[in-house]
Curated annotation (Swiss-Prot):
Binding partners and assembly: The complex is composed of one ATP-binding protein (YfmF), two transmembrane proteins (YfmD and YfmE) and a solute-binding protein (YfmC).
Lipid-modified residues, N-palmitoyl cysteine kind: 19
Main location as per UniProt: membrane
NCBIfam families, sorted: PRK11411.1 (NF008501)
InterPro entries found in the cross-reference section: ABC_transptr_periplasmic_BD (IPR002491), Bact_iron-sidero_bind (IPR051313)
Secretion signal span: 1-18
Keywords: Cell membrane, Ion transport, Iron, Iron transport, Lipoprotein, Membrane, Palmitate, Signal, Transport
The protein's name: Fe(3+)-citrate-binding protein YfmC
Any one GO biological process: iron coordination entity transport
Membrane topology: Lipid-anchor
Biased composition (Low complexity): 27-36
Biased composition range(s): Basic and acidic residues: 37-51
């Protein structure tokens, strides 16, 4: 009888242990499933500072550069805060209509107190301008730091892709880039097959003239369209005198000028200017300062490309 009881106790112990093991496995699976769900809702975003984790779909976004506004707007989001240099008309010009947002100051010195008051769930900052305030921004909200001000065209595309991922809109981002590529390719097809002239854009300020070389943002747009660039260089920008410009002697010259009088106004009476091929052949064109050199987004690059064809070929 005692032997029977011992056997029964042993059997019951085994069954109890089995139940505990099964229960533990079930609990572990449930926990793992929950973990996977949370992981799926969070994304690790790699940026110029390393990596940042962004959760869910950000709704309250603050952008500190104009190309980032171009990106988020094209992805269907209106930022709650924009570093607009206190120029609401410039923002309207970029997005094509008036939008409701709060100015967070200038791109060079955004107001951290105002940014914090907006309670953002994502801040998009420039790798060059905002490097020194990155840690402060990070304390306010998840912050990604990307290239804009010093970005090439390809780096602008990379930044757009990263922003789409951060906003949980990767598929939409891919669609937008495919549409953008088609626009550029269609414009490229309009360039005459026998076009062999070279081209360059210069930024005219009160006391200086800076050429944007083949490795600059707009220089890459010229190349994408099929033009030969007049200044091939690994340095994106090259400040030149009138004498140096006359040696380069571009066939086509686009000039993006600051407000007010510029150094070009002085040059226009100089024989060196008058003898430039672009001047003699009527191939000097204005380039909108905002669209060509400040906005630096995918939509503004399309506008710039269309501007070239319209002005050079009347298309």
């Amino acid at each position: 009888m005692r032997t029977y009881s011992n056997k029964l106790i042993a059997i019951m112990s085994v069954l109890l242990l089995a139940c505990l093991i099964v229960s533990g496995c079930s609990s572990s699976q449930n926990n793992n499933g929950s973990g996977k769900s949370e992981s799926k809702d969070s994304r690790v975003i790699h940026d110029e500072e390393g990596k940042t984790t962004v959760s869910g779909t950000p709704k309250r976004v603050v952008v500190l550069e104009l190309s980032f506004l171009d990106a988020v707007h094209n992805l269907g989001i209106t930022p709650v805060g924009i570093a607009d240099d206190n120029k609401k008309d410039m923002i309207k010009k970029l997005v094509g209509s008036s939008i409701d947002y709060t100015s967070v100051g200038t791109r060079s010195e955004p107001n951290l107190e105002v940014i914090s008051s907006l309670k953002p769930d994502l801040i998009i900052a420039d790798a060059e301008r905002h490097k020194n305030i990155y840690k402060q921004l990070k304390k306010i909200a998840p912050t990604i730091e990307l290239k804009s001000r010093e970005a090439t065209y390809d780096e602008t595309i990379d930044s757009f892709t990263t922003i789409a991922k951060a906003l949980n809109k990767e598929d939409e981002g891919k669609e937008k880039l495919a549409e953008h590529k088609k626009v550029i390719n269609d414009l490229k097809a309009e360039l005459p097959k026998d076009e062999n002239r070279n081209i360059v854009l210069g930024v005219a300020r009160a006391d200086s003239f800076q050429l944007h070389t083949s490795s600059s943002y707009d220089g890459e747009i010229f190349k994408m369209l099929g033009f030969t660039h007049a200044v091939k260089s690994d340095n994106a920008y090259q400040e030149v005198s009138l004498e140096q410009l006359s040696k380069i002697d571009p066939d086509i010259l686009f000039i993006s000028a600051n407000e007010g009088k510029t150094i070009v106004d002085e040059w226009k009476t100089n024989p060196l200017w008058k003898n430039l091929k672009a001047v003699k052949n009527g191939q000097v064109y204005d380039a909108d300062r905002d669209t060509w050199t400040r906005f630096r987004g995918i939509k503004s690059s399309e506008t710039s490309a269309k501007d070239v064809l319209k002005k050079v070929y009347n298309k």
